Curated annotation (Swiss-Prot):
Species this chain originates from: Clostridium botulinum (strain Langeland / NCTC 10281 / Type F)
Function: Catalyzes the transfer of an acetyl group from acetyl-CoA to tetrahydrodipicolinate.
Gene3D superfamilies associated with the record: Hexapeptide repeat proteins, Malonyl-CoA ACP transacylase, ACP-binding
PROSITE patterns from the UniProt entry: HEXAPEP_TRANSFERASES
Pfam family, one: Hexapep_2
One function term, GO molecular function aspect: tetrahydrodipicolinate N-acetyltransferase activity
The protein's annotated pathway: Amino-acid biosynthesis; L-lysine biosynthesis via DAP pathway; LL-2,6-diaminopimelate from (S)-tetrahydrodipicolinate (acetylase route): step 1/3
Catalytic reaction list: (S)-2,3,4,5-tetrahydrodipicolinate + acetyl-CoA + H2O = L-2-acetamido-6-oxoheptanedioate + CoA
E.C. no: 2.3.1.89
Protein name: 2,3,4,5-tetrahydropyridine-2,6-dicarboxylate N-acetyltransferase
BP-aspect Gene Ontology terms: diaminopimelate biosynthetic process; lysine biosynthetic process via diaminopimelate
SUPFAM superfamilies: Trimeric LpxA-like enzymes
Keywords, sorted A to Z: Acyltransferase, Amino-acid biosynthesis, Diaminopimelate biosynthesis, Lysine biosynthesis, Repeat, Transferase
């Protein structure tokens, strides 16, 4: 079944209809030699087993063989998850530990995703763009090239409340820490959003906005460019 992931209602349908998954990892010491490991990934040496699979299948094995098991430890990081995480091995970018990136996200060359960043389904991160610590890019949020999304900043998604227009952050924009860009807003090329701002209307190119709600306070000048320049070394 195909889905139009540019439509918030289609994304919601995709999530609703997706098979929910509760994968676990089990470390087991015991005699499981007579068990059926169909649909379970098994590694073992003697009586030591590491099992990867869905919780209901592994837990059945543990329950049915509890008298043969000496020790058992289970690791779990999600429950009834609808969307898998992105396969980061296919991305030519720097992604630090603790970043959470869902599947069907596009990440450009030499982008940087810092610790604790969250990027939702359908988002696009441009070449050379940095998503700083604990920043959030909601569903279908679009960040252009060489954008800096500051720590704790939020680019709202299209899912809830549903919105047909995603947030669009154009090239060379700097968004300060803890700023919030509301649903459907467009930030023009080269503009700067001050830390803590709440942006409720579109922002034209090459201006500085600040406040809650954010308002234009000046045009980007040489001094502003010097204070907001990016470091290429962080993207190599």
């Amino acid at each position: 079944m195909s889905y139009n992931l540019t439509d918030p209602y289609e994304i919601a349908r995709y999530i609703k209809e997706a098979k929910k998954s509760t994968p676990i990892k089990a470390y087991i010491e015991g005699d499981l030699s007579n068990c059926d490991f169909t649909n379970i990934e098994k590694f073992n040496s003697g009586d030591l087993y590491i099992l990867f699979g869905e919780s209901e299948e592994i837990l059945v094995i543990i329950e049915n063989n509890k008298d043969k098991i000496k020790n058992c430890r289970i690791e779990q990081d999600r429950r009834k998850s609808a969307i898998p995480l992105l396969d980061m091995l296919k991305v030519n970018a720097r992604i630090e530990p603790g970043a959470i990136i869902r599947d069907k996200v596009l990440i450009g060359e030499n982008a940087v995703i810092m610790m604790g960043a969250v990027i939702n389904i359908g988002a696009e991160i441009g070449e050379g763009t940095m998503v700083d610590m604990n920043a959030v890019v909601g569903a279908r949020g679009k960040l252009g090239k060489n954008v800096h999304l500051g720590a704790g900043a939020v680019v709202a998604g299209v899912l809830e409340p549903p919105s047909s227009d995603p947030c669009t952050i154009e090239d060379n924009v700097l968004i300060g820490a803890n700023a919030v860009i509301l649903e459907g807003i467009k930030i023009g090329k080269g503009s700067v959003v001050a830390a803590g701002s709440i942006v409720t209307t579109d922002v034209p190119e090459n201006v500085v906005v600040a406040g809650a709600p954010a308002k234009i306070i000046k045009e980007v000048d040489v001094k502003t460019k010097d204070k907001t320049k990016l470091l290429d070394d962080l993207r190599k």
